[in-house]
C-alpha cells in the first residue's frame, strides 16, 4: 500500500463538517498510509475535531491538515452561478490542490454540477475524451457487482459519448472489480436492435466494431441488478433516474422488512419476524443502500475525483474517501488513457 494524500471538501453535503470530519478520522484510522487535506471553515473544522480530541491518536493527527476556505458553493446554485463565484470556496481550493500536486485526488459531497464543471476546467479531461462521466459500483442480486455510467454528468449524449463511456467503464470495471473482458451493455427501452434513440442505436454499432469490448447488446431497466452485465452504459438522465429508482425501491422494501407500521405495538414484532423469514433477501437489499457503496467517480479526467452523496452519513463518506484512495493507488486515470490509446 502506497502513501497518498487526498483533498476533501468538508463543507460539501447536506450536513457538512458534522459528518465529514468524523468520516475523515475514520478513513485515516483504517488507512495508515493516507493523509488528508481538509478544506473548509477552519473554525467549524477545529470545533468538530475538539469534540473528539481525546480519541484522536498522534499518528492520525499528524496525517491531517486544515486548509481554510472562506466560502462554500451552495447546493441550490446553478452551475453557471456556482462556477462564476467559486473563487475561495472549499470545493475549488480542494480541486486546485490536486492540480498543484499537493493531493492526488479529491472527494466532495457538494453541488454535483459545480464539482463536474470545476474539475473539467481545472484538472482537464484526458486527451481524446470528449466528456468525463459519473460512474458508480452497484451490487447485484447474485452477490457480485457491476459498474454503471453515466449517472448524471451528461444529460444529452451522442453516440461517440456513449461509446467512450463504454470504453472507460470497461477499464474501470477491470481494475475496480478485478474482471477480465467485462460484459458491456447499453441501457435501452428494449433489447431489439430497432429500439431506442438514434444515438443509442449508433453507439451500439460503434461498440460492436471494437473487438476489445465484450459487448452483449441492450439491457432493460428491470435487469440492472441481475448480474447480466458488468458495465451498464447510458446517458446521464436515464442513468440518474435508474440509480435513484433502485435506491428508493430498496429503501422502501427495507423499511417494510423492518416493520415500519402505524401500529406501534405490532411494529417491533413484525420487523423481527420479517427479518427472520427473509434474512437473505434483507441482507441483499441492504447492500443497495447508498451507505454501502457511496461515491460516484468522475472518470475521464487527469486525476481522481469522487462525488459523495449529499446526504451521506459518516460511514458513507468514509467509504467515498476509501474509494478515492483505491483509485489513486490503482492509477485509474492513467489506465483509462492507456486503454484509449490501444
From Swiss-Prot:
Keywords: Cytoplasm, Lipid biosynthesis, Lipid metabolism, Phospholipid biosynthesis, Phospholipid metabolism, Transferase
GO cellular component terms given for this protein: cytoplasm
Intracellular or extracellular location(s): Cytoplasm
EC number(s) reported in the record: 2.3.1.274
Pfam family name, one: FA_synthesis
Catalyses which reaction(s): a fatty acyl-[ACP] + phosphate = an acyl phosphate + holo-[ACP]
Molecular function terms from GO: phosphate:acyl-[acyl carrier protein] acyltransferase activity
Pathway it works in: Lipid metabolism; phospholipid metabolism
Coiled coil stretches, renumbered: none
UniProt cross-references to InterPro entries, sorted A to Z: FA_synthesis, Phospholipid_synth_PlsX-like
GO terms, biological process: fatty acid biosynthetic process; phospholipid biosynthetic process
PANTHER family from the UniProt entry: FATTY ACID/PHOSPHOLIPID SYNTHESIS PROTEIN PLSX, PHOSPHATE ACYLTRANSFERASE
Entry function: Catalyzes the reversible formation of acyl-phosphate (acyl-PO(4)) from acyl-[acyl-carrier-protein] (acyl-ACP). This enzyme utilizes acyl-ACP as fatty acyl donor, but not acyl-CoA.
Subunit structure: Homodimer. Probably interacts with PlsY.
Family affiliation: Belongs to the PlsX family.
HAMAP family in the record: PlsX (MF_00019)
NCBIfam families in the record: plsX (TIGR00182)
Protein name from the UniProt record: Phosphate acyltransferase
Organism expressing this protein natively: Actinobacillus succinogenes (strain ATCC 55618 / DSM 22257 / CCUG 43843 / 130Z)
Amino acid at each position: 500500500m502506497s502513501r497518498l494524500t487526498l483533498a476533501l471538501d468538508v463543507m460539501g453535503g447536506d450536513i457538512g463538517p458534522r459528518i465529514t470530519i468524523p468520516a475523515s478520522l475514520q478513513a485515516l484510522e483504517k488507512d495508515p498510509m493516507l493523509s488528508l487535506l481538509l478544506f473548509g471553515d477552519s473554525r467549524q473544522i477545529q470545533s468538530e475535531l475538539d469534540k473528539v480530541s481525546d480519541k484522536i491518536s498522534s499518528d492520525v493527527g499528524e496525517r491531517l491538515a486544515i486548509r481554510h476556505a472562506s466560502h462554500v458553493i451552495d447546493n441550490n446554485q446553478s452551475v453557471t452561478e456556482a462556477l462564476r463565484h467559486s473563487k475561495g470556496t472549499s470545493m475549488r481550493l480542494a480541486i486546485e490542490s490536486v492540480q498543484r500536486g499537493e493531493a492526488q485526488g479529491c472527494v466532495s459531497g457538494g453541488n454535483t454540477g459545480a464539482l463536474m464543471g470545476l474539475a473539467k476546467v481545472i484538472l482537464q479531461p484526458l486527451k481524446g475524451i470528449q466528456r468525463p462521466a459519473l460512474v458508480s459500483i452497484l451490487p447485484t442480486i447474485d452477490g457480485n457487482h457491476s459498474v454503471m455510467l453515466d449517472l448524471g454528468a451528461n444529460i444529452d449524449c451522442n453516440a461517440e459519448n456513449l461509446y467512450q463511456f463504454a470504453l472507460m467503464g470497461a477499464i474501470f470495471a477491470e481494475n475496480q472489480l478485478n474482471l477480465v473482458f467485462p460484459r458491456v451493455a447499453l441501457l435501452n427501452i428494449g433489447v431489439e436492435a430497432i429500439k431506442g434513440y438514434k444515438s443509442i442505436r449508433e453507439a451500439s454499432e460503434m461498440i460492436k466494431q471494437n473487438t476489445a469490448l465484450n459487448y452483449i447488446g441492450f439491457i432493460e431497466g428491470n435487469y440492472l441488478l441481475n448480474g447480466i452485465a458488468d458495465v451498464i452504459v447510458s446517458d446521464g438522465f436515464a442513468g440518474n433516474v435508474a440509480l435513484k429508482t433502485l435506491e428508493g425501491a430498496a429503501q422502501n422494501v427495507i423499511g417494510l422488512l423492518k416493520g415500519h407500521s402505524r401500529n406501534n405495538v405490532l411494529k417491533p414484532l413484525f420487523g423481527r419476524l420479517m427479518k427472520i423469514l427473509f434474512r437473505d433477501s434483507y441482507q441483499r437489499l441492504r447492500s443497495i443502500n447508498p451507505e454501502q457503496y457511496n461515491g460516484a467517480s468522475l472518470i475521464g479526467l487527469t486525476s481522481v475525483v469522487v462525488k459523495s452523496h449529499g446526504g451521506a452519513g459518516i460511514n458513507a463518506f468514509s467509504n467515498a474517501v476509501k474509494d478515492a484512495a483505491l483509485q489513486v493507488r490503482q492509477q485509474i486515470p492513467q489506465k483509462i488513457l492507456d486503454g484509449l490509446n490501444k
